[in-house]
């Protein structure tokens, strides 16, 4: 069977593919059309110098560039990013980011070439200190009701439009202190989805201390690290955290929750950031 792929007419982040389905062990009589997620090489350039190439969903790339710049410590504040330009290429997308001269000088001292696989986040990191880099401790804030976290996670599931179409993407959502989902970003890579969300928060001037981040994936240490770098004090994941994620959360004053499903959750760090009982 010939495999035919072409972009879906209404979206850039998914495409149509011909598929021969098997149901109950029986092969279908004819091919059907299926929607699949796009996965595109996205190269980030800072002040004209190539810095990282990741595989990502080709949507919300301005959010991604700003969020990546913040969570990776390339810039300290959104104002350090002077401009973002999306430049499509025949074999991918180049995102040209202009940053302040002070940030550019600092970046040169810690430059690394990261060739990522679906937002793996570590490919090309040259030294252990670059992996476990220091990030600020998140400031204390008023406790958020645990019921709001549970409500937010349920609400996020109904807001994953790209996942509903393709079944192939992760989501990162921002919910306020009452569990109302305000923003959702999706990507084939869970780190990319989180970076897009952080960038969207920054572009909309939303205080990261005023709510929580919910993710449809496991919680790796990089996810905790990125939240701490953005000043986000609560990270709730639908799946498990890693041991290193828990240690990073403990050290950065981040409340880390795993297995947040329906009315269940496991709280691994800083339960004082949550109001556990009505």
Swiss-Prot record:
GO molecular function: sulfur carrier activity; sulfurtransferase activity
GO cellular component, one term: cytoplasm
Any single biological process term in GO: Mo-molybdopterin cofactor biosynthetic process
Keyword Ribonucleoprotein among record annotations: no
InterPro entries: Cytidine_deaminase-like (IPR016193), FdhD (IPR003786)
UniProt xrefs under Pfam families: FdhD-NarQ
Similarity comment: family membership: Belongs to the FdhD family.
Job of this protein: Required for formate dehydrogenase (FDH) activity. Acts as a sulfur carrier protein that transfers sulfur from IscS to the molybdenum cofactor prior to its insertion into FDH.
Protein name, per record: Sulfur carrier protein FdhD
Source lineage: Bacteria, Pseudomonadati, Pseudomonadota, Betaproteobacteria, Burkholderiales
């Amino acid at each position: 069977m010939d495999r035919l792929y072409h972009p879906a007419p209404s979206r850039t982040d998914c495409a149509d593919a011909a598929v021969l389905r098997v149901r109950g062990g029986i092969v279908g009589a004819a091919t059907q059309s299926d929607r699949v997620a796009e996965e595109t090489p996205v190269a980030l350039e800072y002040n004209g110098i190539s810095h990282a190439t990741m595989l990502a969903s080709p949507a919300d790339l301005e959010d991604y560039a700003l969020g990546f710049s913040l969570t990776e410590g390339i810039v300290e504040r959104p104002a350090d990013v002077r401009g973002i330009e999306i430049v499509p290429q025949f074999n991918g997308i180049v995102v040209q980011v202009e940053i302040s001269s002070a940030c550019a000088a600092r970046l040169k001292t810690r430059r690394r070439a990261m060739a990522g696989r679906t937002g793996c986040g570590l490919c090309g990191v040259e030294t252990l200190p670059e992996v476990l880099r220091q990030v600020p401790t998140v400031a204390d804030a008023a406790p958020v009701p645990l019921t709001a976290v549970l409500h937010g996670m349920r609400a996020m599931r109904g807001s994953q439009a790209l996942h509903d179409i393709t079944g192939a993407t992760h989501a990162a959502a921002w919910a306020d202190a009452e569990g109302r989902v305000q923003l959702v970003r999706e990507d084939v890579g869970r780190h990319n989805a989180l970076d897009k969300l952080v960038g969207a928060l920054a572009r909309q001037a939303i205080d990261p201390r005023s709510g929580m981040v919910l993710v449809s994936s496991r919680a790796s240490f990089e996810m905790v690290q990125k939240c701490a770098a953005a000043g986000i004090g609560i990270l709730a994941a639908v799946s498990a955290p890693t041991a290193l994620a828990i240690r990073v959360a403990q050290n950065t004053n981040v409340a880390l929750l795993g297995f947040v499903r329906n009315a269940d959750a496991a709280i691994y760090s800083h339960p004082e950031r949550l109001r556990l009982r009505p």
